[in-house]
Amino acid sequence: MARIATLVAVLAASAAVAAVAVASTRSPKALRTAIFAAARKEHSVHYVEHGAASVLRQTMVSDVAKTRGVQKITFTLQGEKGQFTVIVVNRIAYLRGNSLALHAYLGFTSAQTASYHGRWISIPPGNGRYEDLAASVTLPSFLHDIYPGAPLALVETTVGGRKITGVRGTSRQGGVTFQEAVLPDAKLRPLAVSDVDTKHGFVDAIKIGRWNEPVRVKAPASAVPIATVTAG
């Protein structure tokens, strides 16, 4: 499976990144500031994220802009395949998924899943599901989610034959603390991100590119409010 091969490659790369600290006139904090300052000047980005845990393999393909974006997620959970899509338009999240995604992955009840799989559901800010669903589906949210925290260190690896100096720190998501490395492109924008949690066996890798392409996303017609879905 292609995404498994990608994860293996990224594991090797992230191990190298974690192992090699480099000397530089720029401090880790200054490099982090420069990377995210460059990214915040842009209007949109495309990224592909591969993740793996003990019983889960997943791929997220996303196109995100300042106030809108779309994220398509495919996954295999304990050998079963699922998929769902999240759209964010003007701070409203819209979700559509198959039965496995709604019930086993996202925690909807069996009755809710039976009624609403394959249909768009709208989730406003303030709803308990909003934060997790809307995470990384706009450009500001994505940059927030890949921002490495202290302690910081400079790291070096080779991508496509080119040596790249990045910054390594920590990222806390869903109660799990990852060792996170962010590598910049030639314009100092994020190019690749790796997250590893050896304690729980979580691995995550993101390839970033195609900056400033149009993100044409509209709110789905006839979406069912989440309050209606959960009222039954």
Language model: regions and residue ranges:
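N-terminal leader/targeting segments and the immediate start of mature chains
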Residues: 4-68, 150-158, 213-232
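Short, solvent-exposed coil/turn segments at beta-strand boundaries
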Residues: 39-44, 60-72, 87-93, 160-164, ...
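Beta-turn initiation residues at beta-strand->coil junctions
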Residues: 49-53, 73-78, 97-99, 171, ...
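Short, solvent-exposed loop/hinge segments that bridge or flank secondary-structure elements
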Residues: 53-61, 127, 131, 175-176, ...
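An acidic-aromatic
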Residues: 65-134, 203-205
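Transition segment at domain starts
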Residues: 132-144, 152-154
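Gly/Pro-enriched, hydrophobic low-complexity segments
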Residues: 155-224
